[in-house]
Amino acid sequence: MGRVVAELVSSLLGLWLLLCSCGCPEGAELRAPPDKIAIIGAGIGGTSAAYYLRQKFGKDVKIDLFEREEVGGRLATMMVQGQEYEAGGSVIHPLNLHMKRFVKDLGLSAVQASGGLLGIYNGETLVFEESNWFIINVIKLVWRYGFQSLRMHMWVEDVLDKFMRIYRYQSHDYAFSSVEKLLHALGGDDFLGMLNRTLLETLQKAGFSEKFLNEMIAPVMRVNYGQSTDINAFVGAVSLSCSDSGLWAVEGGNKLVCSGLLQASKSNLISGSVMYIEEKTKTKYTGNPTKMYEVVYQIGTETRSDFYDIVLVATPLNRKMSNITFLNFDPPIEEFHQYYQHIVTTLVKGELNTSIFSSRPIDKFGLNTVLTTDNSDLFINSIGIVPSVREKEDPEPSTDGTYVWKIFSQETLTKAQILKLFLSYDYAVKKPWLAYPHYKPPEKCPSIILHDRLYYLNGIECAASAMEMSAIAAHNAALLAYHRWNGHTDMIDQDGLYEKLKTEL
């Protein structure tokens, strides 16, 4: 009798294990990976996506990466007399863990962001000037603004603390189907509320004074996003975090991360411009009709096309920037009308006319960077000494005592304006570009899932545009594409992740 019972228990146990291996997610067989994936845009978002898609789908999938200009996208550099300088995104926060990982994995080197003293100019005078002495800076800030600088630091730290949860979620492979759901998983209704309120409104409600907001907050928004405190509060917090210490950059230029990720992902770069994308039915080698995406692109004057199982769009869907048409989708893919901010970067090698900002002699000026307030009638957002991408230390003056200065402005500077800023100069180069979204809360972020297997990364820029935000969006899109391909619905848009993962420690 005992033997019969033992055999029955053994049989039931075997049956249970068999059922579990068939039904439990851990034991479920993965669907065969896609044959081909297309990524449109080879900036930090597109190349990060290629890197993470390769990790998830394995070595056999073919990844084509389309770029009509240079790898690196908006992480562009400008040349001044044979030296390269960052045109835009130049510093990285010490808590930007994706960027830190990329630099480590790719064998690149990090350099500390250049230091130097900073001043704030209101159109008439310097309302604040940094000192070389920390205690003097503290006294100046407390004397003029009370303890508002400390309160501001605490507010930004609270936002960053919640934001850091994304790294734990992504390390456990969780993904989100919309920007709003991602932000809600990090900071709940508070983060969503920040998208729908201006930074000015948020900080006024928190009790910050008009003087502090005008003199200390608005200039940071102007240098980082070319806009005022009317931007949304979330991107405002991201911008203010760039005032922290420990900022760094990639030696040789931040765009090296993009070329490194492209190479590490073993993706195929296609130097062409994508014209349109259309869903079509195609018979694959299995003999079964399959829904695929035809990507039609142009190289020079030649038009070509290819079919893909999955497509990721990693360039802003703005007519002035990508001009991609989505053909015959049902329902139609919505038009995107996100306006991007026009900004002009000007690099000038010359001797600054310090009398614009101060009556002190030029050798006593001492400031490396000057930011401007919103009510300044000066025609620039900011001006500062910049190192080349190869310099590891703060830049030294050339033999004639001149530096290379980077100027951000809303409009292209005229020669007369440059001559007003500089006593003399021997080189100037300008780059007008659409750098980041024009923020006007309340913000409605574009969908991440445009169609069944068609994804959009740059919608995250409506929350905040930054290198790390693009890398986060890329990792999320790669995870989302992977889980939806394999039917892992339990890994998408999960509620209570923070508490769930906290209990697993």
From Swiss-Prot:
Belongs to the prenylcysteine oxidase family. GO terms for biological process: prenylated protein catabolic process; prenylcysteine catabolic process. This is Prenylcysteine oxidase 1. Transmembrane segments: none annotated. Its cofactor is FAD. It is an enzyme of class 1 (oxidoreductase). It is found in: Lysosome. InterPro entries: FAD/NAD-bd_sf (IPR036188), Prenylcys_lyase (IPR010795), Prenylcysteine_Oxase1 (IPR017046). Widely expressed. Keywords: FAD, Flavoprotein, Glycoprotein, Lysosome, Oxidoreductase, Signal.
